[in-house]
Amino acid sequence: MKKISLLLASLCALFLVACSNQKQADGKLNIVTTFYPVYEFTKQVAGDTANVELLIGAGTEPHEYEPSAKAVTKIQDADTFVYENENMETWVPKLLDTLDKKKVKTIKATGDMLLLPGGEEEEGDHDHGEEGHHHEFDPHVWLSPVRAIKLVEHIRDSLSADYPDKKETFEKNAAAYIEKLQALDKAYVEGLSQAKQKSFVTQHAAFNYLALDYGLKQVAISGLSPDAEPSAARLAELTEYVKKNKIAYIYSEENASQALANTLSKEAGVKTDVLNPLESLTEEDTKAGENYISIMEKNLKALKQTTDQEGPAIEPEKAEDTKTVQNGYFEDAAVKDRTLSDYAGNWQSVYPFLEDGTFDQVFDYKAKLTGKMTQAEYKAYYTKGYQTDVTKINITDNTMEFVQGGQSKKYTYKYVGKKILTYKKGNRGVRFLFEATDADAGQFKYVQFSDHNIAPVKAEHFHIFFGGTSQEALFEEMDNWPTYYPDNLSGQEIAQEMLAH
């Protein structure tokens, strides 16, 4: 028995050595990817240069996945690990802390792409105090063909930088696949640009980027599962909602059970269909030769069942309350005095990031979300708003230091009151007023802060107004509002934070 055990151990060792030698002999990279879109895009770019492995199979939610010890070892033994975004694979940041960065290269497929807040977002003009706060970001960018192209491009560029000897192959493979994605994008543009109904109702709120890029509106509903019938109370609510908005289809992420489809059809007069979020492919899909492009073509066909039918704009079941303090709606009695300590810290102007193009994605999002201005018009608007030559402001409990043209000027300040201003849209904002006690403060004699808050709280960013004439003169300034964020944030981090408002 002992001899048999030794023999088996020897054979296993020989097998492992053989596998290792084979890996070296074929010269291929070993790339581990997280879930299906990342796997597909990486495989298309790498081609025959790599063995690309999928970590998360069908039936497992990438958000909730926790890598086993075996999976961690697999990643640690890889040449490259590719994931989409930490907002999707929430377990990745912890994993990255354990990886040997010299041995395993990592690629974040979204790169410098900015993400939208995970919840609904109200957009509007920059009448200070109108924006809400969200801190979770939507990672489902792969469901928009035009953004899928950006993911492929970033994977291509990252692999090329890490393995320059294979750059030509990566570029050739990526170009061929991007051509197919461009054709898919064209099909979406042609299929949806003349949509008669621009709203679609889905049980899985994963299609925000698709809707945004192709002129549609995603309306998400809750309490509906493809596997089970809704409760009588929920069915009554759905029936009323469907009839009120004349909804023809409700989409789920997989085929609804026949019982659910029959119930919704009979009671609510609405049909069900699939919008596949493409987080995985089933074994049946794979055997049938399905892939990212073919599934996205099916999604387009499903969407057109709604968009080709005329109907009124579909409103969310529960309208979001936009008349909040953050959006500039409050009672006068709620406004409280604040001290300079609320703004204490080291701050940087955002104007340089606007000038170098870091905020261009922000303006593109705003243009698509609001439809009020083009990207170029938004950039011009914020250029005027952010413009300043004061690059940094360092604040203590009673002093402000302004860095201007490489020179520093520091003064002591006292709080002198607050002023409620009413904007054209009807919402309001509060400016908190400070005055320098130094006679030589010049253009920094009078200072006003606006940061979307109306009572004592630590500011996360602020707009500032300063001048040497009077506080009253500053009240008239509505077009130029130099804006500052903590100086330890990168331009990319600030841009992402802006989208969270």
Regions found by a protein language model. Give the residues of each.
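Mid-length scaffold segments of soluble, non-membrane domains
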Residues: 200, 383-428
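An exposed acidic His-Trp-rich patch
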Residues: 412-458
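Positively charged n-region of N-terminal signal peptides that target proteins for export
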Residues: 1-8
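His-enriched metal-coordination microenvironments in redox/metal-binding proteins
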Residues: 425-426, 453-474, 478
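Extracytoplasmic metal-acquisition and chelation regions
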Residues: 5, 19-334, 341-349, 436-443, ...
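Short, solvent-exposed loop/hinge segments that bridge or flank secondary-structure elements
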Residues: 329-332, 337, 348-399, 437-455
